[in-house]
Each structure stands twice: as C-alpha cells, then as structure tokens.
Regions:
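Conserved beta-strand elements of the Class I
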Residues: 20-22
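Class I SAM-dependent methyltransferase SAM-binding "motif I" and its flanking Rossmann-like core
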Residues: 83, 89-159
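C-terminal and late-domain segments of enzyme folds
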Residues: 1-18, 27-41, 45-48, 127-129, ...
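A short helix-to-beta-strand connector/capping loop
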Residues: 50-53, 109, 173
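Portal/gating segments that form or line small-molecule/metal binding sites
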Residues: 28-85, 89
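General beta-strand structural signal in soluble alpha/beta enzymes
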Residues: 55-58, 81-82, 113-116, 177-180
Length: 223
C-alpha cells in the first residue's frame, strides 16, 4: 500500500512541508497493550518510511478520546489514520468525542482520513453484527454514502457468504454495499468520484446487481 499512502501524503494539504500524520489505534483498545502497541508501531514505521512526521496517539477508551491534549494533537495532523480492530468499539469510543471532533476539523480544512479495516467500516451507515450473520447491524457515522463498507473482501471465507446475501437483502432502493479487496483502497472526496488504488478490486453491490472496479477505475457513491 506504499503507493496509496504516498498519494495521500502528496494530497493532504501539507503545502510543501513534511506531512503530519496521527495514528489512532483505538479499534484495538479492548485487545490490550500488546495489540495497541503493535498497531501504533506499524503505523509510525510505515508513514515514517514515506517521509512523514508521525505520532501515534494512545486513544483507547472514552477518557483518552476526550483528553484535550490528544484532541489537540489530532487537530494538528494532515492525515488521521485509524487502524484495525473492532469497528463497533471504535465507533462507540469516537462518537461525540473531542478527538473525533478534532479529526472532523482536519478533514474540513482539506486533510485526509485514512482507515484500515475497522477504520474504514465506520465510514458507512452501518456495521454488520457478524455474530448475527448480517441480520443485525449497528448505526455508525455515515460519512461515506454507502450502507456498508466491507474490507478484506477477497479474503472473505466461504462460511461468510450468507452474510453478504443477508446484507444485500437488507439494502433499500438506492443503497449500496462497498466491498474492498485486501491491499486495495478506494480513494476520493465526498460528493466526487472514487478511484480504486492498490493491487486488486472494489465491488459495489445493490439489492439486485453488482459492479466490480479494477485499479484505476472510478465510480460514484450515493448517486
């Protein structure tokens, strides 16, 4: 994903200086220090190699998400990167928090949201409850105009295929489900077109149809 993230750094509004990246391991907050530290280390090392100034901010629970110093650190970023873990927990901690409000201000001034796995899933309108095989879901931020964002799509085991069927059955007219393959990203702006970047494909499903987009192809959401 080096090419994708290099593109994000080149288009984050840094205006000739080193881009500032904040990595948030929040989605792994229930997994213990070892997991949080692993996600933080991977993010810092990755973006440092790409030439950015990077800091991992230890937002792992409601208290740290409302820490004013953490919120201030996020607000100084050009790229806010949410790593993987539990999307429901990530949404629970971020909702109405000072850190989330700071992140929103970053994007409003032209900065970049980057999300891995859980970090991408919270951008749709809902996150499926995998234990209920898609029959239940939890409302999330709805930033991107699609009902569900499903990462690791090409690695979906056969046993989870009924989940996709259940989610598609729940889609209403005009709603979509966006599946993104591993080592692949969908990059765009709200209200504009989205481009597939990385190594594989993105898949856009409606209740009755589907389209697959290869690297370099563009499409619209919510239209």
């Amino acid at each position: 994903m080096n090419d994708v993230d290099a593109y994000l750094l080149a288009n984050c509004g840094a205006d000739g200086r080193k881009p500032r990246v904040v990595c948030l391991p929040t989605a792994a907050g229930q997994e213990g220090d070892a997991s949080v530290n692993r996600w933080s280390k991977m993010g810092v090392e990755h973006f440092t190699r790409l030439g950015a100034d990077v800091v991992a901010v230890p937002v792992t629970d409601a208290d740290s998400a409302n820490d004013e110093s953490h919120a201030a650190a996020v607000e100084e970023a050009d790229v806010v990167y949410f790593s993987g873990g539990n999307p429901m927990y990530l949404h629970q901690i971020m909702k109405d928090s000072l850190v989330w409000k700071s992140a929103q201000r970053v994007w409003e001034r032209g900065g970049v949201y980057a999300g891995c796995s859980a970090g991408a899933m919270i951008l749709g309108s809902e996150v499926p409850d995998f234990r209920a095989m898609g029959l239940r879901s939890v409302p999330v931020f709805g930033v991107v105009p699609t009902a569900f964002v499903i990462p690791h799509f090409d690695a979906f085991p056969m046993m989870w295929k009924p989940l996709l069927f259940a989610l598609r059955k729940r889609l209403r007219a005009g709603e979509t489900l966006l599946g993104v393959d591993e080592d692949t990203a969908v990059v765009g702006t709200l209200g504009g077109e989205w481009t597939v970047m990385g190594k594989s494909q993105a898949h856009l499903f409606t209740k009755d149809g589907e389209r697959t987009y290869a690297v370099g192809e563009t499409f619209s959401l919510g239209q």
